[in-house]
Amino acid sequence: PHVYGKTDADAVFGFLYAQCEDDFPRVELNYITAMGRVAEVEGEEKLYHDLRQRLFYDTLMAESIYRTSPAWLKRLCQAFADGVNYYLQTHPEVKPKLINRFQPWMPFLFSEGSIGVDIESISVNRIKEFYGKGSVQLEVEHRNEEPEPRGSNGFAIAPARSASGNAMLLI
């Protein structure tokens, strides 16, 4: 959606409210997944998926990052939480599966950006073997070439390569 506000925080609030209007279940599931709490909603078979998630992302770390963030960033994060929570307040017919109140630290669960680590490449079965009754076999993959990078289309341009003489970061 196109959202306009007098401040950046106003725009964040409006964007999250609009996103919840479009698909609150997806918004909530994204954060349930990020917190490694899917098994609480979908059942025990998701426990190892949650474990894998928690090996990479830590809610306590997200809270710590939020607490030490500059005031301008805290305002944006609070606007995120306020936008989702206001949506829930004004739509009592919407019943969250797990998260009844969104917190301003939650966006830091995604602080790696879209080009961060790909936890899906870590085998849930290997995690089950390691923590369960099975044994883990070490695998060494030999490659003659580097693996193809995966992620978003973000890239940087050095000042010497730009017409303006300025560095550019395109995300």
Regions found by a protein language model. Name each.
Residues 2-168:
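Substrate-recognition/specificity elements adjacent to catalytic centers across diverse enzyme folds
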Residues 171:
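Extended polysaccharide-engagement surfaces of secreted carbohydrate-active enzymes
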